[in-house]
Structures are given as structure tokens and as C-alpha cells.
């Protein structure tokens, strides 16, 4: 910064008002002609220098105008600062830097008691401690903003798809060479089809054997292995029975999920299913409406089908007693009327339950007044 006398109260280059930019594009011109100037954190400051204030003793009104944009810590008049005739120069210090930014933007080139104000930053009045604090606050702000942007970019990255669940389970449960061969030799009569290939571990090796291998004796170990072999046979029978049953694949997946002992594997499966099951809210509502319509149409079709081929079970209820009118002509007319009433009653469609609920919950229509 160049100064005329090198003192804080002198005129610096950044105090001089910059000329209006005449090379700005037409579509970028605003209501007021402005200059192009870039401010760094070193040039910005809590101290504002107000030039062009009329010398009519309006310091109180000036401070009140600037106090609208933030708390003011101190203010004073600069008598030694060179100014035009019949004008004064004031120095105002804001508590926050953002308040000084807003006040400079709003009050620069504003009319005040017949004069045109010129507001600029005055960082030369800052102490070393104030400058250090200003730079630290700016550094913390930049760190916070960049961290938020990094988190946002990390959220936008696509989630990598899970590979085959079989590979992931093998990674979670590594093979144990010594114990596995011994257990295989102890159960030669168990058929190979009993071992389920969809499980993350062999049915012949329960987790209790792995957990208690170091604490149990050899006899206890053999007993547990034999118990595990029996449970493996039972599991093979259950699996064969399940194959012949009419359960859906989704139900089998749920039973498998309950049998998986590793919580991390369950979380991975749950996350993969949640990703595949995600749908927008509007799509869910449309799907529900479509299902309701399909169920309604299916119900009407079933009703018409059962009415056409009605199967009576149990004793037949007594019908409407026919009244003898003592006249053949009247009896024929009454029979025709009863038959017509039955046709009308049977042809009336049953309103769906959704429409009944809508009619009940909706407010009654307001009647129009007759004038």
C-alpha cells in the first residue's frame, strides 16, 4: 500500500474511489454504474473510512445509519485526514467483519444530508492481534466450506455394487485347514448333499467348536463334533423337505438371513436390498393406487363369477312367502313385479370400500342460497 506520508492517518491508494468500468457487458450492467475491484482478506477490515460527510454535526445520525447493519465497537472523527471543504471524515469499527462488508455495500455512494458518501476499508488501523484473528477466522471458514463440499461429493459418489454373496461370506469365514480335515474324517457316513452350499460355513462345523477349541479337551471336542454331525443330518433333512415345499424364494432368503451368524454379512445384505428397494415417493403412491385398482377389479370379477355359479352350502333359507291375491291376473302381475325387483337388486353393483370411506370423510357440499 502506498501512502503520501506513510502514517495510518494518511491517504492510501485503496482509499481512492475507482472509476466506473466502461467495458462491462450490457447484460451485466446494473441500475447503478459500478467499478470492478477485487477484495482479498488482507484488504477487508472491520474498520470503515467514511468520506464526504457534510460538516453539520451529524455524527450521531451517521452512526445510527451504520448501526443498522451491525454492532459498532467504536467510532471517531479523523480531523487530520485530508478532506474536501465543508466535509468530514469518520472512522467506524464494527464488531464483525461481515457487518462491515454489508455496511460498505449498502452505504457507499449514498446521499447523506446533501452529500455523497464514499465508504472504503481501512485495514491500516488494525493491530497485529486483530489481523491474526481475522486471518484465523478466514482460514477456519475456508476449512469448513471445503469440508462440507467434500462430504457432499462423497455422498454423490455411487455406492459400489456388492459382488456375489458367496465370495463375501468366504472372505468373512476363512477355511481352517487342520480342524476341517479332522472333522471331515469323523463323519464319513454323512452324505455330501447334506452340506448346504448356500451357507457361509459348513453345517458340520458349528461356531461353538471354533470358539471353544482352545478351552475344551479332546473328548469334549469329539463329542461336540459328533453332535454337530447329527445336527448336520437333521439340517440336511430339513433342507430336502424345504426344497419340496411351496415356499417362495424370498421366504427362503429370510430364513437364511436368520441363520447367518455374522452381523457384518447381515448388514451388507440389508444394505444391498435397501439400495435395490429404493423408489421415489410419487412412484410408491402410483404403485399403491395401481394395486388397489387391481384388487378392486379382481374383487368385482370374483363376485360376478360366484353369483353366476353360486354354490349353496347348508339348508336353504326360506324365501319370500307368496301371497295369494285370489285372482290369477293379480297373482301374475305380482310375480312379474317380484321378479323385476330381484333383477334390479342383483344388477346394482356394490360400491368399493374406498369410495365409501371417501364419501364419509368428505365434507357435505354447501348448498347454494336462493335469492
UniProtKB/Swiss-Prot annotation:
Molecular function terms, GO-annotated: RNA binding
- For this UniProt record, give its keywords in alphabetical order, as a comma-separated list: mRNA processing, mRNA splicing, RNA-binding, Spliceosome
User: In this protein, which residues make up the domain named RRM?
Assistant: 46-124
Q: What GO terms in the biological process aspect are recorded for it?
A: mRNA processing; RNA splicing
Q: Which residues cross the membrane?
A: none
- Tell me the first and last residues of the signal peptide: none
Q: Where is this region: Disordered?
A: 157-191, 348-371
User: Can you name this protein?
Assistant: RNA-binding protein 48
- Organism (species): Mus musculus
Amino acid at each position: 500500500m502506498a501512502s503520501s506520508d506513510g502514517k495510518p492517518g494518511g491517504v492510501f491508494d485503496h482509499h481512492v474511489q475507482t472509476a466506473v468500468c466502461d467495458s462491462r457487458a450490457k447484460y451485466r450492467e446494473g441500475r447503478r454504474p459500478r467499478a470492478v475491484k477485487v477484495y482479498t482478506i488482507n484488504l477487508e477490515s472491520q474498520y470503515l473510512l467514511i468520506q464526504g460527510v457534510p460538516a453539520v454535526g451529524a455524527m450521531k445520525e451517521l452512526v445510527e445509519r451504520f448501526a443498522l447493519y451491525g454492532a459498532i465497537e467504536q467510532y471517531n472523527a479523523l480531523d487530520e485526514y485530508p478532506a474536501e471543504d465543508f466535509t468530514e471524515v469518520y472512522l467506524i469499527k464494527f464488531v464483525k467483519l461481515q457487518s462491515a462488508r454489508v455496511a460498505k455495500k449498502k452505504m457507499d455512494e449514498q446521499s447523506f444530508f446533501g452529500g455523497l458518501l464514499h465508504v472504503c476499508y481501512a485495514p491500516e488501523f488494525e493491530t497485529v492481534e486483530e489481523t491474526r484473528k481475522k486471518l484465523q477466522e478466514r482460514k477456519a471458514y475456508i476449512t469448513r466450506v471445503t469440508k462440507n463440499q467434500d462430504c457432499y461429493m462423497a455422498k454423490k459418489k455411487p455406492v459400489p455394487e456388492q459382488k456375489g454373496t458367496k465370495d463375501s461370506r468366504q472372505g468373512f469365514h476363512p477355511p481352517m485347514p487342520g480342524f476341517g480335515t479332522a472333522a471331515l474324517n469323523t463323519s464319513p457316513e454323512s452324505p455330501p448333499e447334506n452340506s448346504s452350499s448356500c451357507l457361509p460355513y459348513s453345517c458340520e462345523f458349528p461356531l461353538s467348536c471354533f470358539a471353544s477349541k482352545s478351552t475344551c479337551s479332546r473328548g469334549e471336542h469329539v463329542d461336540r463334533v459328533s453332535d454337530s454331525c447329527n445336527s448336520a443330518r437333521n439340517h440336511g433333512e430339513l433342507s430336502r423337505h424345504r426344497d419340496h415345499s411351496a415356499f417362495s424364494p424370498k421366504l427362503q432368503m429370510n430364513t437364511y438371513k436368520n441363520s447367518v451368524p455374522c452381523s457384518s454379512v447381515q448388514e451388507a445384505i440389508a444394505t444391498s436390498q435397501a439400495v435395490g428397494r429404493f423408489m421415489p415417493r410419487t412412484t410408491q403412491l402410483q404403485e399403491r393406487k395401481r394395486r388397489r385398482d387391481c384388487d378392486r377389479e379382481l374383487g368385482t370379477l370374483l363376485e360376478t363369477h360366484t353369483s353366476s355359479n353360486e354354490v349353496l352350502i347348508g339348508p336353504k333359507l326360506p324365501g319370500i312367502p307368496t301371497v295369494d291375491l285370489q285372482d290369477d291376473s293379480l297373482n301374475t302381475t305380482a310375480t312379474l313385479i317380484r321378479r323385476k325387483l330381484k333383477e334390479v337388486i342383483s344388477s346394482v353393483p356394490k360400491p368399493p370400500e374406498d369410495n365409501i370411506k371417501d364419501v364419509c370423510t368428505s365434507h357435505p357440499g354447501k348448498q347454494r342460497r336462493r335469492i
